[in-house]
From Swiss-Prot:
Domain ABC transporter: 470-708
GO function term, MF aspect, one: ABC-type transporter activity
Species this chain originates from: Arabidopsis thaliana
GO cellular component: a single term: cytosol
Residue stretches spanning the membrane: 109-129, 161-181, 240-260, 340-360, 361-381
Family note: Belongs to the ABC transporter superfamily. ABCB family. Multidrug resistance exporter (TC 3.A.1.201) subfamily.
The protein, known as: ABC transporter B family member 28
Record bears the keyword GTP-binding: no
Length: 714
């Protein structure tokens, strides 16, 4: 090891260790060293075509992404450095990103700039012409009245035209930017690791796309009108310049107004950020309570929990009201102080300006213009104060979005598949182009490109899963949010290709965790899962999802029609009505579907609530039949059904399981007796393995479970 050189650097959230080959054995030791990888050479004949490939690519396998140990590369690669530089900016939303998105609309931005100058010029010219108007009236100015009024009429006509052009173009730019941001945030949430969704509630995540992005949206939409935002700034700046040009003696009076307002803005900035944050948090909490209550309305009804939910929501309403009152108090105090500063400035102007007119040092028209500019400055300053207040809310919202979406790393194996599908294939769906508009820096800056280059081709994945065995090899696992609680402890199990394996055991033994690992919602903390001898982490998750199908005890249907729910088995493909009907018939669902009011076009309600449990199961089975995945997982698929529904569903499941590698999890042992092998899980390990008759003869844990259930039915 003395001659081995090691270079350690960070890539975003991924730690990459660049070392000489002599270091590989020590890094692979948590997975049993190199032996597990090289032992593929002794695989059965069914995987013989892959042996040479495995020998030749063992280095690539060693470099592949694995949970728990960093990937290994032999030499630094320029792709890594490129990826590293892209990952330096961790925030999902930054002002640099907003500007880059806006700068794509150069023509509209140019129009906005010109019309903004036109608006401000018209507004700033009006007090000057007002002063001239009074001078003409008192005979001090020899200009004809009709000519002066014509000029004023032109100004009054041009100002709304410029305003319409400015607001229209600025709105178009910002709505395009917001559409891209919504798409990117939605995509970022989708590709987070599973523990992200364990940590955050649905209401919190919904709030990112509604209230938080709404605050960002309002910073432009609510500040492009007169006397707000950019226009207010140009009017303040232009007014100060004109005032010093007209009268250097009176200008400092209004300059004091600007100084006072600047102090107010600084105080406002410090005082309102926590208030805005608490207000947004209270709003998200309310949204989460509403979502959770309505989604579990049957549970609430069954326990007569309406009063409790009303009490909980009432407390949240009061918290939101109090935070709103506090926020309103801050706004009112700042606006009141601003008005007081304006009135004091006006009073000083009347006193000083009037005395100078009396002594002949200033013309009446100049003082009248000053009064007009005072009101212009008043509205503009108040608009700026409101704009700065909106900015505080926007900063708080952006901080909330970035803190949530950067707290947990993205699931790179999933993100890579999406990037590949969207960027390397011709996008047929117009809606997906929103996810391309932000450019590659937004989409893939967090991905380790060198790790991605080591993922295996997906061309052979479907062949592997149809012909190869699925092996869980010395798998250890603890949920990321409970790292001290080991759920699986060295579990090993082989699902033979084309056969049915039943998994039984007491609650908490780790059965559902095995399902989540096979579905790759999580990755093993230690050990590996292979298919046909290939580590499943060598394939991106979007491709893996296409070869694994899960039917749960409570399948989730979308608020779509029956046909659309079945077609969701192939969400990225066009599915014909004939294929949908064929799958429904195979799932014993066709008869009940055609009896529905609109047949296959009948809406199923939220989460399929308008269908019975057996009907939902058969629709889910039809969806899996259409998917035609070689690996099938049945997680308590019939445990909640009555006898008639169970018979129909079990008949459909038998057709679904044919020639597929199937894992069946069931508490009722009568449903697993015909399995090719039965595995008994206890304390995160497989303690017994065999057929029903073999395990009964052993008189172990399985025999005890069988005896217990027999007694329960006697």
């Amino acid at each position: 090891m003395a001659s081995a050189t090691t270079l350690l650097f960070h890539h975003g959230s991924t730690r990459v260790l660049v070392a000489r080959r002599r270091c590989q054995a020590s890094v692979l030791r948590p997975y049993g060293g190199l032996k597990p990888f090289l032992s593929f050479c002794s695989l059965p004949n069914s995987t013989a075509p892959f042996r040479d490939s495995l020998r030749a690519k063992s280095d690539g396998l060693a470099r592949a992404y694995v949970t728990g140990a960093p990937p290994i590369v032999e030499e630094p690669d320029p792709k890594i450095e490129e990826s590293k530089s892209e990952a330096e900016s961790k925030d999902l939303i930054s002002w640099g990103l907003l500007w880059s998105l806006m700068s794509k609309h150069k023509l509209r931005l140019s129009v906005c700039l010109l019309t903004l100058l036109g608006c401000s010029t018209c507004t700033l010219s009006m007090p000057v012409f007002s002063g001239r108007f009074f001078e003409v009236l008192i005979g001090v100015r020899p200009e004809p009245l009709w000519r002066l009024l014509s000029k004023i009429a032109v100004l009054y006509s041009l100002e709304p035209i410029f305003t319409i052009a400015f607001v229209t173009n600025m709105t178009a730019i910002w709505e395009n930017v917001m559409a891209i941001l919504r798409a990117q945030i939605f995509r970022r949430v989708l590709i987070q690791k599973a523990e992200f969704f364990d940590k955050y509630k649905v209401g919190e995540l919904t709030g990112l796309l509604t209230s938080d992005l709404g605050a960002l949206n309002s910073i432009v939409n609510d500040n492009i009108s007169r006397d707000r935002g950019f226009r207010a700034f140009t009017e303040v700046f232009g007014t100060i310049c004109i005032l010093f040009t007209l009268s250097p003696q009176l200008a400092p009076v209004l300059g004091l107004l600007m100084l006072a307002v600047s102090v107010l803005v600084a105080v406002y900035k410090r005082s309102t950020v926590p208030v805005y944050k608490s207000h947004g948090l209270a709003q998200a909490t309310m949204s989460d309570c509403v979502s959770e209550t309505f989604s579990a309305i049957r549970t609430v009804r069954s326990f007569s929990g309406e009063k409790r939910q009303m009490s909980i929501f009432g407390s949240q309403i009061l918290a939101y009201k109090l935070s709103g009152l506090k926020l309103g108090t801050f706004k009112s105090i700042n606006e009141s102080i601003t008005r007081v500063a304006v009135y004091i400035s006006l009073l000083a102007l009347y006193c000083l300006g009037g005395s100078k007119v009396k002594t002949g040092e200033l013309a009446v028209g100049t003082v009248v213009s000053f009064i007009g500019y005072t009101f212009t400055l008043t509205f503009a300053v108040q608009g700026l104060v409101n704009t700065f207040g909106d900015l505080r809310g926007t900063f708080a919202a952006i901080d909330r979005i970035n803190s949530i979406l950067n707290a947990v790393d993205i699931d790179e194996a999933l993100a890579y598949g999406l990037e590949r599908d969207i960027h390397t294939k011709k996008v047929q769906d117009e809606n997906l182009k929103l996810f391309l508009s932000a450019g590659p820096n937004v989409n893939i800056r967090h991905l380790d490109k060198y790790y991605m280059s080591n993922l295996k081709s997906t061309n052979n994945l479907r062949t592997l899963t149809w012909a190869g065995d699925v092996c869980l090899d010395d798998v250890h696992f603890a949920y990321p949010l409970r790292p001290d609680v080991k759920v699986l402890d060295g579990l090993s199990l082989t699902l033979n290709s084309g056969t049915v394996t039943a998994l039984v055991g007491s609650s908490g033994a780790g059965k559902s965790t095995i399902v989540q690992l096979l579905a790759r919602f999580y990755e093993p903390t230690q050990g590996r899962i292979t298919v046909g001898g290939e580590d499943v982490r060598m394939f991106d998750k979007s491709e893996w999802a296409k070869v694994v199908s899960i039917v749960n005890q409570e399948p989730v249907l979308f608020s779509l029609s029956v046909a659309e729910n079945i077609a969701y088995g192939l969400p990225n493909e066009h599915v014909s009505k004939d294929d949908i009907i064929k799958a429904a018939k195979a799932a014993n669902a066709h008869d009940f579907i055609i009896s529905l009011p609109q047949g296959y076009d009948t809406l199923v309600g939220e989460r399929g609530g308008l269908l019975s449990g057996g009907q939902r199961q058969r629709v889910a089975i039809a969806r899996s039949l259409l998917k035609n995945a070689p690996i099938l997982i049945l997680d308590e698929a019939t445990s909640a059904l009555d006898a008639v529904s169970e018979r129909l569903v079990q008949s459909a499941l038998n057709r679904l399981m044919k020639d597929r590698t199937t894992l069946v999890i069931a508490h009722r042992l009568s449903t697993v007796q015909s399995a090719n092998q039965i595995a008994v899980c206890s304390d995160g390990k497989i303690i017994e393995l065999g057929t029903h008759s073999e395990l009964v003869a052993q008189k172990g844990s399985y025999a005890s479970l069988v005896g217990t259930q027999r007694l329960a039915f006697e």
